[in-house]
């Protein structure tokens, strides 16, 4: 069994936030892979299903970001799983918008949701980081992370979410390199591109208060089933 946890903040107020891209990714998998209806358990919304012959639990913690580990840890212990049986999907300022990276273990990078999961589950779980870019100025980071994606972001965002949902079997089977290649090709990146070097992080700061290298997302054609959902989500919002 595998737990796939998407991180975000609960409620319609935060639904379109960049910080909620983890929720969006899990919603896309749920929509594409034919899971059960969402229900409430473990301080979270959960749905059960099967991907690539493996039983999978999708989970969206409803504790708010900083306490995400309470929900994921409770589910892990209930099903008698180990950190290796968990995949966490979340936003990453260190990555250009639309890029993705996956790894096992590592530091929390100032992300309070990851810090909480580390505390409740240990560190040796898989982390799928989805780039949301950086606004370029430290003072704008908080508003950027807790602000909605702009209409101009919908094309790459739709492609990214579609690709994750379509290739969820790769995520479940641990075919990480293949999945990264699929995402890079779908979002206009280079499959083997080297991840840019991030500046040294300051201890004790939340990632929404850090200054990081600025990078602008590419505009891509809006295609795929997720496009309509995103248009509904952001249609009434300005850029």
From Swiss-Prot:
Q: Which Pfam families match?
A: Pept_tRNA_hydro
Q: Which CDD domains match?
A: PTH
Q: Name one GO cellular component term.
A: cytoplasm
Where do the annotations place tRNA binding? 14, 64, 66, 112
InterPro entries to which the protein is assigned, alphabetical? Pept_tRNA_hydro, Pept_tRNA_hydro_CS, Pept_tRNA_hydro_sf
Q: Where does the entry annotate site (Discriminates between blocked and unblocked aminoacyl-tRNA)?
A: 9
Reactions mediated catalytically: an N-acyl-L-alpha-aminoacyl-tRNA + H2O = an N-acyl-L-amino acid + a tRNA + H(+)
List UniProt keywords, sorted A-Z: Cytoplasm, Hydrolase, RNA-binding, tRNA-binding
Annotated stretches, region: Disordered: 188-225
SUPFAM superfamilies, per this entry? Peptidyl-tRNA hydrolase-like (SSF53178)
Task: Give an example GO molecular function.
Answer: tRNA binding
Catalytic residues (positions): 19 (proton acceptor)
Gene3D superfamilies registered for this protein in UniProt: Peptidyl-tRNA hydrolase (3.40.50.1470)
Q: What is its EC number?
A: 3.1.1.29
First and last residue of the signal peptide: none
Against PROSITE patterns, the record matches this protein to: PEPT_TRNA_HYDROL_1, PEPT_TRNA_HYDROL_2
What's a GO biological-process term for it? rescue of stalled ribosome
Q: Which family does it belong to?
A: Belongs to the PTH family.
Please describe what this protein does.
Hydrolyzes ribosome-free peptidyl-tRNAs (with 1 or more amino acids incorporated), which drop off the ribosome during protein synthesis, or as a result of ribosome stalling.
Task: Describe, as the record does, how this protein assembles with itself and its partners.
Answer: Monomer.
This chain belongs to the protein called Peptidyl-tRNA hydrolase
Species of origin reads Sinorhizobium fredii (strain NBRC 101917 / NGR234)
Q: From the UniProt record, report the name of the gene that encodes this protein.
A: pth
């Amino acid at each position: 069994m595998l737990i796939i946890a998407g991180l975000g903040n609960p409620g319609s107020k935060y639904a379109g936030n960049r910080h909620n891209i983890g929720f969006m990714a899990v919603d896309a998998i749920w929509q594409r892979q034919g899971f059960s209806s969402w229900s409430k358990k473990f301080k979270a919304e959960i749905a059960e299903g099967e991907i690539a012959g493996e039983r999978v639990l999708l989970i969206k913690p409803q504790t708010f970001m900083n306490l995400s580990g309470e929900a994921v840890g409770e589910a892990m212990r209930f099903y008698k799983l180990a950190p290796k049986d968990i995949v966490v999907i979340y936003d990453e300022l260190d990555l250009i918008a639309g890029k993705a990276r996956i790894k096992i273990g590592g530091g929390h990078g100032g992300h309070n949701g990851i810090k909480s999961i580390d505390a409740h589950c240990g560190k040796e779980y898989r982390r799928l980081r989805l780039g949301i870019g950086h606004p370029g100025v430290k003072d704008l980071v908080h508003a950027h992370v807790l602000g909605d994606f702009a209409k101009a972001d919908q094309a790459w965002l739709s492609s990214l979410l579609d690709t994750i949902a379509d290739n969820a079997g790769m995520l479940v089977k641990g075919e990480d390199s293949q999945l990264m290649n699929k995402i890079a090709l779908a979002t206009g990146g280079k499959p083997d591109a080297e991840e840019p070097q991030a500046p040294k992080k300051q201890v004790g700061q939340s990632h929404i208060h850090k200054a990081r290298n600025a990078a602008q997302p590419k505009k891509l054609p809006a295609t795929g089933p997720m496009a309509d959902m995103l248009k509904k989500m952001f249609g009434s919002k300005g850029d």
